[in-house]
Amino acid sequence: MTNIIRNTTGFAVHIIKEYITPDSIVVDATCGNGHDTLHLAQCGPKRLYAFDIQEQAVASTRDLLVSEGLSEALASGRIKLICASHSDIDAYISSPLDVAVF
């Protein structure tokens, strides 16, 4: 038997991926180094918005996503990286959210 509880991120991804469908609108409210954003993107949501107030965090997230083959998702707008506080979410997203992580 595989132990899925190796770390909190792995455990959270295991649970969250059950709720993300190809029609889901998903938010990573604090993208940081991009690892959670990457996991969410790999679940295949319709849209993924990743917020951070630090430009370096957004740049690091972009670099990670590109290195993992998600350039097209970024270019198409399926994944949107936003350098702003998640408290300003209403300025960027008008549709209901299906999943949000902090």
Which role does the model predict for each range below?
Residues 1-25, 29, 35-42, 59-99:
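S-adenosyl-L-methionine
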Residues 17, 40-42, 53-70:
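Glycine-rich phosphate-binding loop of nucleotide-binding enzymes
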Residues 23, 45, 96-97:
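A general structural motif
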Residues 25, 46-47, 78:
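Residues at the starts of beta-strands that form the adenosine-phosphate
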Residues 27, 49, 82:
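Conserved Rossmann-like nucleotide-binding pocket used by diverse enzymes
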Residues 29-31, 97-102:
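Conserved proline-anchored active-site loop of SAM-dependent methyltransferases
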Residues 47-53:
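Conserved SAM-binding motif I beta-strand of class I
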